[in-house]
Swiss-Prot record:
Region (Disordered): 1-187, 197-216, 240-260
Induction details: By dehydration, cold stress and abscisic acid (ABA). Induction by dehydration occurs after 1 hour and increases to a maximum after 10 hours. Cold stress induction peaks at 1 hour and 5 hours after start of cold exposure.
Organism: Arabidopsis thaliana (Mouse-ear cress)
Region called 2 X 21 AA repeats, Lys-rich, residue ranges: 184-247
PANTHER family: DEHYDRIN COR47-RELATED, DEHYDRIN XERO 2-RELATED
N-acetylalanine PTM sites in chain numbering: 2
Protein name (record): Dehydrin ERD10
Entry keyword set: Acetylation, Phosphoprotein, Repeat, Stress response
Expression (tissue specificity): In stems, cauline leaves, roots and flowers. Low levels found in maturing seeds. Absent in dry seeds.
Gene Ontology molecular function, alphabetical: actin binding; copper ion binding; lipid binding; nickel cation binding; phosphatidylcholine binding; phosphatidylserine binding; protein folding chaperone
Name of the gene: ERD10
Residue numbers of Phosphoserine PTMs: 61
GO biological process: cold acclimation; intracellular water homeostasis; protein stabilization; regulation of membrane permeability; regulation of seed germination; response to abscisic acid; response to cold; response to water deprivation
A GO CC term assigned to this protein in UniProt: cytosol
Recorded family membership: Belongs to the plant dehydrin family.
């Protein structure tokens, strides 16, 4: 019985201790002034684990294309490096002084060869021209000999008449002044005819000057009557005006006395 009791006692005591430990953290969490206490420091192992996990996640989340672009941008040369490379390439491609001299010598030798060929061609052409000139001279001498023979046949070395063709030069005839005179006379005659038809414009003939004086007198009389008619019309208007009648009567009486 005693052994059974011993076995049962520790079984009952052990859960009591566990209950006390489990209740202790619950009381701490429910405390009102726990925020004033210092926070528990995180261990360094935990920080390293968190950082490694974060890096692993970021590496998985980043796409491969973005990583490749980033690496290319890092490896790209700067503007200064590009300019330096271009300058080096230009200097490498530039020919040296020896190359330039070699090229100039080769070009001068080729030009001299061409000049030599041209000189030979010119000499050959000159020879051909000289030969052709001699041939032309011989032909001219033959022609001159034929012409001399023809001249010997004719007296005094005259050429046949068929060789010389007379050249006739025709000059345009100048316009004569006399051609314009009949037109002027015709115009004058026409104007004279018109003037003869008008009264008072008849010409005086050279022989009978006294006979043509009568129409001049006849034409003068109607011309003198025109101002009298005008004066009479004006006098009639003036007579109608008041204060002008007395003056006109006195003037008329004076005119009648003078006429008598």
């Amino acid at each position: 019985m005693a052994e059974e009791y011993k076995n049962t006692v520790p079984e009952q005591e052990t859960p009591k201790v566990a209950t006390e430990e489990s209740s202790a953290p619950e009381i701490k969490e429910r405390g009102m002034f726990d925020f004033l206490k210092k926070k528990e420091e995180v261990k360094p192992q935990e920080t390293t684990t968190l950082a490694s996990e974060f890096e692993h996640k970021t590496q998985i989340s980043e796409p491969e294309s973005f990583v490749a672009k980033h690496e290319e941008e890092e490896h790209k040369p700067t503007l200064l490096e590009q300019l330096h490379q271009k300058h080096e390439e230009e200097e490498e491609n530039k020919p040296s002084l020896l190359d330039k001299l070699h090229r100039s010598n080769s070009s001068s030798s080729s030009s001299s060869d061409e000049e030599g060929e041209d000189g030979e061609k010119k000499k050959k052409e000159k020879k051909k021209k000289i030969v052709e000139g001699d041939h032309v001279k011989t032909v001219e001498e033959e022609n001159q000999g034929v012409m001399d023979r023809i001249k010997e046949k004719f007296p005094l070395g005259e050429k046949p008449g068929g060789d010389d063709v007379p050249v006739v030069t025709t000059m345009p005839a100048p316009h004569s002044v006399e051609d314009h005179k009949p037109e002027e006379e015709e115009k004058k005659g026409f104007m004279d005819k018109i003037k003869e038809k008008l009264p008072g414009h008849s010409k005086k003939p050279e022989d009978s000057q006294v006979v043509n004086t009568t129409p001049l007198v006849e034409t003068a009389t109607p011309i003198a009557d025109i101002p009298e008619e005008k004066k009479g019309f004006m006098d009639k208007i003036k007579e109608k005006l008041p204060g002008y009648h007395a003056k006109t009567t006195g003037e008329e009486e004076k005119k009648e006395k003078v006429s008598d």
